[in-house]
């Protein structure tokens, strides 16, 4: 048995409506907490929309009528979801895997970075800036976003990775409150990857992500 044999992997084809998806995700998180459902990694795409995290500021929504806007219970600020972007919802029981939210976020970052590495893309994290970054100097850009919530030590929401979305759609917001940085994608970097190949890489690196949840220091943060 591998470390993730008891975790369900779900890949939903097409475009998943946001409100219905979040409702199902929250119900699943509650069921995991109650011991009534398996943990879940849920990979999907959404139709074009903006979501506002708990730290979002009103002036960061530049074009409020462009796409539907949803208030989200995740951490972070405004982000865009749409076709060509792989969204991963990560529903794990951190009560059994390590009660450390910072460690959890870092593990997701490292997971996405390792996935990008399979395609020859050097991703990295940056101190003080949650997310995944590529390039340096004038070429520095964000390729992946992370926004999570933890309730009673069960995580939900997760990450997004720009495979080949319409990057012009990000112009309706200040992405993650960082207006001075560009947004990029695998396709923009010259890597026209199929979504199935990205999913396979995520699955390949998932055991290391789980192992990364056990940090040497533990968080006392209430959830």
Curated annotation (Swiss-Prot):
Keywords: Acyltransferase, Cytoplasm, Transferase. The active site is at residue 176. GO terms for molecular function: lipoyl(octanoyl) transferase activity. The keyword Phosphoprotein does not apply. Pathway: Protein modification; protein lipoylation via endogenous pathway; protein N(6)-(lipoyl)lysine from octanoyl-[acyl-carrier-protein]: step 1/2. It is an enzyme of class 2 (transferase). GO terms for cellular component: cytoplasm. It comes from the Bacteria. GO terms for biological process: protein modification process. It catalyses: octanoyl-[ACP] + L-lysyl-[protein] = N(6)-octanoyl-L-lysyl-[protein] + holo-[ACP] + H(+). Disulfide bonds: none annotated. It is found in: Cytoplasm. Residues 35-214 form the BPL/LPL catalytic domain. Its EC number is 2.3.1.181. The keyword Cell membrane does not apply. In the reaction, the free carboxyl group of octanoic acid is attached via an amide linkage to the epsilon-amino group of a specific lysine residue of lipoyl domains of lipoate-dependent enzymes. Belongs to the LipB family. This is Octanoyltransferase. The gene is lipB.
């Amino acid at each position: 048995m591998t470390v993730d044999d008891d975790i369900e992997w779900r890949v939903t084809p097409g475009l998943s409506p946001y409100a219905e998806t979040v409702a199902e995700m929250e119900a699943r998180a509650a069921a995991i907490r109650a011991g009534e459902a398996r943990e879940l990694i849920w990979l999907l795409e959404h139709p074009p929309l903006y979501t506002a995290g708990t730290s979002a500021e009103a002036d960061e929504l530049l074009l409020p009528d462009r796409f539907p806007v949803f208030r989200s219970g995740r951490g972070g600020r405004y982000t865009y979801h749409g076709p060509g972007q792989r969204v991963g919802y990560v529903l794990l029981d951190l009560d059994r895997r390590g009660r450390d939210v910072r460690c959890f976020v870092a593990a997701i970052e490292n997971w996405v970075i390792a996935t990008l590495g399979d395609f020859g893309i050097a991703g990295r994290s940056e101190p003080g800036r949650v997310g995944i970054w590529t390039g340096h100097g004038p070429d520095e850009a964000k390729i992946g976003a992370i926004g999570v919530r933890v309730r009673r030590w069960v995580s939900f929401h997760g990450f997004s990775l720009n495979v080949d979305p319409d990057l012009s759609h990000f112009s309706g917001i200040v992405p993650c409150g960082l207006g001075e940085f560009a947004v990029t994608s695998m396709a923009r970097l010259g890597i026209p990857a199929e979504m199935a190949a990205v999913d396979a890489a995520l699955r390949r690196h998932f055991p290391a992500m789980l192992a990364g949840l056990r940090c040497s220091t533990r968080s006392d943060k209430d959830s």
